[in-house]
Amino acid sequence: MSHLVEPPPPLHNNNNNCEEGEQPLPPPAGLNSSWVELPMNSSNGNENGNGKNGGLEHVPSSSSIHNGDMEKILLDAQHESGQSSSRGSSHCDSPSPQEDGQIMFDVEMHTSRDHSSQSEEEVVEGEKEVEALKKSADWVSDWSSRPENIPPKEFHFRHPKRAASLSMRKSGAMKKGGIFSAEFLKVFIPSLFLSHVLALGLGIYIGKRLSTPSASTY
């Protein structure tokens, strides 16, 4: 027997079936009415119906079958791709235990170096601050222990001593007998004679020097 594919039944058939007591099944959710609604009867009823209708049965249309298969294929492919991507990402994200240990060791080394450098810097800064405090304390102690500049109560101005000048008046001969004393005359007369002799000799020498050029010109 040849089975003929019948298109979807019209709406009035559904109403008739509902009146007869047959309830059509709702379409599957998410398929957007891509399947044809078929009334579900018992096996005997179906056989009788097939006999009455001359071997005709309600089957899904080719377009609805094609759309349903495509949707199933797409859903399966999407599900498989999601699983493969999640597995790949989990494999990539989870490092091996050796690499994890190396990373942890490197991080600990970097953190220990950072802490050591920070501790050294803090020690140096603390030493500088202590030295500055010591210097400030020394300056304060020096300033407080210095003697106060208290001026004396009485001022006495003293003139500097003059150097003794050489003069005949302050000589011993003048003090004893005056100008006409023997000691004064012994000193004064020879000095006077020597001064005159020197003046006379200097005059004669100058006169001779002046007379010689005039005679040579003639």
Swiss-Prot record:
Membrane topology according to the record: Single-pass membrane protein
Keyword Nucleus assigned: yes
Compositional bias annotation for Pro residues: 1-11
Short motif (BH3): ranges: 125-147
Nucleus is among the record's keywords: yes
Subcellular location: Nucleus envelope; Endoplasmic reticulum; Mitochondrion outer membrane; Membrane
Record field: transmembrane: 187-207
Signal sequence coordinates: none
GO MF term set: identical protein binding; lamin binding; protein homodimerization activity
Keywords associated with the record: Apoptosis, Endoplasmic reticulum, Membrane, Mitochondrion, Mitochondrion outer membrane, Nucleus, Phosphoprotein, Transmembrane, Transmembrane helix
UniProt modified residues of type Phosphoserine: S61, S116, S117, S119, S165
Post-translational modification: Undergoes progressive proteolysis to an 11 kDa C-terminal fragment, which is blocked by the proteasome inhibitor lactacystin.
Family that this chain belongs to: Belongs to the NIP3 family.
Subunit record text: Self-associates. Interacts with BNIP3 and STEAP3. Interacts (via BH3 domain) with SPATA18 (via coiled-coil domains). Interacts with PPTC7; this interaction promotes BNIP3L degradation.
Function: Induces apoptosis. Interacts with viral and cellular anti-apoptosis proteins. Can overcome the suppressors BCL-2 and BCL-XL, although high levels of BCL-XL expression will inhibit apoptosis. Inhibits apoptosis induced by BNIP3. Involved in mitochondrial quality control via its interaction with SPATA18/MIEAP: in response to mitochondrial damage, participates in mitochondrial protein catabolic process (also named MALM) leading to the degradation of damaged proteins inside mitochondria.
Protein name: BCL2/adenovirus E1B 19 kDa protein-interacting protein 3-like
Gene source species: Mus musculus
